């Protein structure tokens, strides 16, 4: 990959000039000037996902210049490098091949001269056999009962993805009851264990190294709870499986290594749901639906790798997002799914985006002098409308938003879905076009008020509009559709990282806090006052010691 400061490119400088000339243009003006704007600035993917980006503060020239930027930083070679297994995770010396995990074409993918696909397919076959055994009831616990509950113990990428996907695809779930434990706060494991029966519970311990502090603390507590009731350490083998690569530690824990499911160092945590980390997904939905999830992502991978930038959905979304982040100085993006099943979707891509592109050092090791990754947040509609949309409509911050919704619901109860979609359609219209002072006054006049009576109220009811949004309407939530949506956002994040000239696949920012926590933990086991830190940290620790006594 080339190391190019984007702000020094011809395209960036042209974008600065273009922005200065167009920053005050109104969406209402752009739509009025071009009746075909929706047709021009929307695209349908596989007759299943409509991406409408017409309500953005862009023109043909804006997109042309943004695409010029993608060419000038040589995005094409970066895409090829990722798919071809080059070690683009430079700081860790690793390839980045979550795409190989869902490579349904079985095209050879080489890492260090070796095709990884035979191993990928072998692990998938092992996952399928395990899932089929558990789901069918063939797998028995220590008292001969079939498994009814599955507890996934992981954190970060070993938790967020499986939680989000199993929730988003709940209409496809089977009889197994899924539980997820991530927080090292003992409350999380304690409350979960209240709801399961050791005779019918399978624990999945998801940690590549089998040393992750939070995960192993929870796993050891779960094992102690289980052995205390089951009465025999040997029974652990029938109730625990590992998603890991540390054979020695897995065996020492008491797990049969035949029930250890491996993945590779070229799988990043936040991209690992396609690997053995996706075991709870396959257990909850059945392996066939897990395969459909992979298929959907693979099809989006193919679209991303082969489609011209002008029609390439992840590239277009990335470029439009960069336009706001780096030129309009927007600090955040909201992801707003109008689908209750997708209630963890924004949280999942909060990690996916902020852990990937929350970097202030470029690929040359220099501090950047431009903005990189945005803050990602969001909640499902319509809940968010009664929480934070006030600021989106009338606040002082520009917040580009992605609105997502299924055309067809899995729960056709009365007129719930038409009401949900009425809000989905209304919000992007309201954000784009607002309500003028004249329109507010006309409403009051129509209600029999005089302008003199309402003059003090009018300013508060004006909506400026010109708030940009993408609308992503899909036919119905299915495993294949969700796979495509996840891959779409993954590739959007990748494209932005390439243009910003940062490494998107490491996460050194999580290390310092962990190191300090490991230093502080022994200090908490002593009653002596702590003086080795700054006055604030010393004061916090010593107050805790006094209060817990």
UniProtKB/Swiss-Prot annotation:
Catalytic reactions of this protein: alpha-D-glucose 6-phosphate = beta-D-fructose 6-phosphate
PROSITE patterns the UniProt entry points to: P_GLUCOSE_ISOMERASE_1, P_GLUCOSE_ISOMERASE_2, P_GLUCOSE_ISOMERASE_3
Enzyme class at the top of the EC tree: isomerase
Pfam name, any one: PGI
Domain of life: Bacteria
GO terms, biological process: gluconeogenesis; glucose 6-phosphate metabolic process; glycolytic process
Pathway: Carbohydrate biosynthesis; gluconeogenesis; Carbohydrate degradation; glycolysis; D-glyceraldehyde 3-phosphate and glycerone phosphate from D-glucose: step 2/4
Keywords: Cytoplasm, Gluconeogenesis, Glycolysis, Isomerase
One GO CC term on file: cytosol
Annotated CDD domains: SIS_PGI_1, SIS_PGI_2
Major localization listed first in the record, in broad terms: cytoplasm
UniProt-recorded Gene Ontology molecular function terms: carbohydrate derivative binding; glucose-6-phosphate isomerase activity; monosaccharide binding
Similarity comment: family membership: Belongs to the GPI family.
Stated name of the protein: Glucose-6-phosphate isomerase
